[in-house]
Amino acid sequence: MTWETLQSLKVAAMKACTCLNPLDTAMGMFGCLLGYETIWEQMKDDHIPDLLVGISRESRRVDEDPGVIVPDEFLHEIMTVRYPNPNMPDTSQRIATDTSQKLGIRYGVTLKRYYNSTVPMHRVSRLKFIPLAIAGWLRYLMGVDDNGNAMQLSPDPLMDSLQKRLEGITFGCTDFGEYALESILSD
C-alpha cells in the first residue's frame, strides 16, 4: 500500500468516524426532533453547535491523526463554512435516512476504541456527547418531536423492527425496560 493510499484511508476514516459523518447524523436526528428543516438553520440553535463540537472532541481523543489535514482545521471549516451555508440545501430528513445502517461506523468505531483503550481518561463512562447523539436517535425512533407532535420519519430498512421494540415507551416516559434499548443498541 502506498503512502498516499494510506493517508487517504486515514482521511476517509477521520471523516466517517470523527469530524463529519457523526456530526451529520446528530444533526439529522436533533434537527427532526427540534423542527429544523435545513442544516444551516440548526447552526443558529443555542445548543446544536456545542453538541457537534463535543461529539468531534470525544471522537478525536481516540482517533488517529490522518497527517494530511489537521482535524481541528477541518472541523472549524465544517462548523463555520459548510454547515451555516444557506446555499447547501441539506435537510434533517434526508440526513436521517437509513440511520440504523450508519450508527455502527459513525459512533461504534469510536466506542470500540474507548472500550479497548488502556488510557484512564479514555473510558466510555466519561463520554457525554456521543451517548446523547445515540439517545437522540432512540428518541427520534418514537416518531414524536420535542413538542409532543407526531412527526414523519425518514426511510430506514429497520424502522418497523426498531419501532416494534420500542412499543410501550411513550413520549415523556421515564420508566421503561432496559431490554428494549439494549436489544436495539446491540444490533
Each predicted region: which residue ranges?
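Non-transmembrane, aqueous-exposed alpha-helical and coiled segments at domain scale
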Residues: 1-187
